[in-house]
C-alpha cells in the first residue's frame, strides 16, 4: 500500500520489475465476482446479476460477498428457498445505507423537511441532462445516520466525466439544501454530508481537473497515495491557494443558485412529489418519474399549439422567423 516509502535500491531494475495493481473491479469483474459468490446459492428466475453488478459501481469483492450473504439471509427470513432480485437490491441498500432505524421517530415538521430535501435532490437531477436516473427515494431513517436518501443508479459504467456532468452532480448534491431554502426559508444540518461531498468534488474540479475559468489548466494539488486515504497536498503559492478557495466557493454558490432556480420554477411539481413521498415514505424511481413525465407532458402540450392554430396565428410575411417554443428542460 505504500510503495513510495520503499528504499530506491530495492526498486532498481532487475529486482521488482512487475507491479500488480489490485484495484476495485470494473463491471465485468463485479459480475464474475457475483457469479462466484452465488454459485452455491439457489437463485430465482428473475435474478439479473448484470443489473446488480451495474448498480454496485465502486464495490470491492468483500462488499459483494456481504451483499450476497445478506440477500440469502433475507430470503430465509421471509421463508423462501431461493434468492430473488429484490433480495439482492434490498441487501445492496443495506450495505450502503444500513438497516432502518425503527426507533427513530421524527416530528411532522422534520418529516416534511426531509421529504422536500430528498425530492430536491431527485428533481434537480431529473430536470437536467447528464444526470444519473433516480431509482429510489426514502425518508425512512437508517443506521448510517441518514434521515433519508435518494438513490441514483448509473445506466452504464463510465470512466470519464465532462465538466457539464460534474456541474450537474454538484447541483444535485446541493438540491436538498436548495429545497429547504425555497420551501421553508431555512438551512438545516441535514445537508452537512451533501456540502462535504460537494466541496470535495468542487475542489478536485479546480485544483486537479483544470476546470476553473480563472485559474485555467493548472494542477494545484497532488494526491499523496490513492491506495490509502487519497489525501491531497497543495503545491502552489499561498496567494494561488486563496484564489483556488475563492473559485471553489464561487462554483458551489453558482450551482446552489442554479438548483434553487430550478426548484422555484418547478415549485408545484416539488410540492406534489414531496407530499406523495411524505405519505408513502419510500417511492421507486418509476413512481417519481411518473410525476416528472406528466409535468413535462403538460409543459409540452401547453407550449405547442395545434397546427391549425399555428397557421392561423402565423404572420402574413414569411420572412419573419418564429421563435421556438420552450422545451420542458428549459
Stretches with model-predicted labels:
Residues 8-9, 22-89, 94, 98-99, ...:
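Conserved C-terminal "switch" segment of AAA+ ATPases
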Residues 102-113:
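Short pre-active-site segment immediately N-terminal to the catalytic Zn-binding motif
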Residues 113-116, 122-330:
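Soluble catalytic regions of large protease machineries
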Residues 19-27, 41, 58, 156-162, ...:
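Flexible beta-alpha connector loops of hexameric P-loop NTPases
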Residues 3-15:
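Short regulatory helix/loop adjacent to the ATP-binding pocket of P-loop NTPases
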Residues 1-3, 25, 127:
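A short beta-strand-to-loop transition that corresponds to the Sensor-1 phosphate-sensing loop
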